[in-house]
Amino acid sequence: MYQNFVTKHDTAIQTSRFSVTGNVIPAAPTGNIPVINGGSITAERAVVNLYANMNVSTSSDGSFIVAMKVDTSPTDPNCVISAGVNLSFAGTSYPIVGIVRFESASEQPTSIAGSEVEHYPIEMSVGSGGVCSARDCATVDIHPRTSGNNVFVGVICSSAKWTSGRVIGTIATTQVIHEYQVLQPLK
């Protein structure tokens, strides 16, 4: 009997690395959720250093996504997407993070309707003062369901109560082309 073993996140040495600075304005899950990218996330791996200002009204709820375009060339439609997140939010923002998948005809979408986003929950921990950390993976369909669309995956950050202030941290995503290893049985 053989076992399949799926590894958790391991940030690759060769990555598309860039910093995002500016303002983040979360949108309600029923509205258009902003997609944050550097305009050049087209690699199988991306590390995003996020230094942004959270511009929200008092006790605003909403979400934002940090995304990358996936490589759709593998013949197997299912691929493991690995995510590592370390973020610090100002004030009393307590976010929930997860892996998301969505399609867009655009090469670099700036927003996506909340109803068009598929959510994959991941294991995370939240500390006091709006600090969150997550490291997990999910199996995602990487082929477009609508011909001509681009497939994007990323990390969504949602909260029922955002507080205005700084967002600082790193989000790393990796598309794992070879998703599992076959282990020999124990003797």
From Swiss-Prot:
Keywords: Capsid protein, Host-virus interaction, Viral attachment to host cell, Viral genome ejection through host cell envelope, Viral penetration into host cytoplasm, Virion, Virus entry into host cell. Its main location: virion. It is found in: Virion. Coiled coil: none annotated. GO terms for cellular component: viral capsid. Gene3D superfamilies: 2.60.120.20. Attaches the circulating virion to the bacterial lipopolysaccharides which serve as receptor for the virus. Determines the phage host-range. Probably triggers with protein H the injection of the phage DNA into the host cytoplasm upon conformational changes induced by the interaction with host lipopolysaccharides. The virion is composed of 60 copies each of the F, G, and J proteins, and 12 copies of the H protein. There are 12 spikes which are each composed of 5 G and one H proteins. Belongs to the microvirus G protein family. This is Major spike protein G. It comes from Escherichia phage alpha3.
